[in-house]
Regions:
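Flexible, low-complexity charged segments
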Residues: 1-108
Length: 108
């Protein structure tokens, strides 16, 4: 029998993107849900949420609009997000976040 999935919704992020040659003043509005390994992982994430959100804000603000265009770009951002969240958890040697799901993605 497969374990019941555990999800954690994060508050929406609104960040200014890094300007590139063609665009400046671009904004990313992004909503995420994390699929985590267990209820214990969710509790650990909630405990360290300010640090995790800070890491994600930095990650998102380092992107350009061109880097976020297309399905492959979104898949790459999801992978980077998963890596950043897992790296922000203290003392963890295995991935605790197993998937990143976008529930809002607006590039302005």
């Amino acid at each position: 029998m497969e374990a019941t999935p555990v999800y954690m919704d994060l508050d929406t992020f609104t960040v200014s993107l890094k300007p590139d040659a063609h665009d400046s003043d671009r904004i990313l509005y992004i909503g995420l849900t994390l699929k985590v390994a267990s209820a214990e992982t969710k509790a650990l994430l909630e405990k360290h949420l300010p640090e995790t959100r800070s890491h994600l804000l930095v990650l998102f603000s380092q992107q350009t609009a061109a880097e976020l265009t297309g399905d492959q770009a979104k898949a790459l951002l999801a992978a980077k997000t998963k890596d950043a969240v897992n790296a922000s958890l203290p003392g963890q040697h295995k991935p605790m976040v197993t998937n990143v799901l976008f529930n809002a993605f607006i590039l302005r």
